[in-house]
Swiss-Prot record:
Subunit structure and binding partners: Homodimer.
PROSITE patterns: PUR_PYR_PR_TRANSFER
Tagged with keyword Transferase: yes
Origin species: Koribacter versatilis (strain Ellin345)
One function term, GO molecular function aspect: adenine phosphoribosyltransferase activity
Entries under NCBIfam families matching the protein: apt, PRK02304.1-2, PRK02304.1-3, PRK02304.1-5
Protein name, UniProt field: Adenine phosphoribosyltransferase
Reaction catalyzed: AMP + diphosphate = 5-phospho-alpha-D-ribose 1-diphosphate + adenine
EC numbers: 2.4.2.7
Pfam families from the UniProt entry: Pribosyltran
Pathways involved: Purine metabolism; AMP biosynthesis via salvage pathway; AMP from adenine: step 1/1
Keywords for the protein's UniProt record, in alphabetical order: Cytoplasm, Glycosyltransferase, Purine salvage, Transferase
Protein family according to the UniProt entry: Belongs to the purine/pyrimidine phosphoribosyltransferase family.
GO cellular component terms attached to this protein's record: cytoplasm
Amino acid sequence: MSESTTGPCHDSLKAYVREIPDYPKPGILFYDITTLIKEPVGLARTIDGITEHFLNKNIDLVVGMEARGFIFGPAVAYRLNAGFIPIRKPRKLPGETVKHTYKLEYGEDTLEIHKDAIQKAQRVLVVDDLLATGGTAVAATELVKQLGGEICGIAFVIELDFLNGRERLKDYDVYSLLHYDK
């Protein structure tokens, strides 16, 4: 089911993304979205691009992962007339939570969501800024499913195609605005 949609309209957004070599460590090329979101046109076209893909999916809730999913998720939720649910690092949410621990290259990480955030069968869109290896997105989908939500799609601003994160999400409608192959 995983699909890839990018067109000239979206590719032009790359002009707003700053490339920083050797960050956060030597050999890494970092794609900085702060230059994208500081420009009203860049931010608007990003939100519009994600929203347009999911307009007819009857989304009830948008879930965004800490931290940059919080930038795009609420705006997408507003445009889709949906609610917004944050997924956070451990001990950042005040109420009762459920958690999912997942493996990283060197260690593990955990994400949490409020236990009452999603009702059974609610239609959920997961939004984040970047798809790299897919670990964070998989953890988010597991949390949504654990609460009984139905995942209607996963949206990213940027996808690093060379890391093959999409493979881990092949059961979902994955939509990325911008693709980078290096």
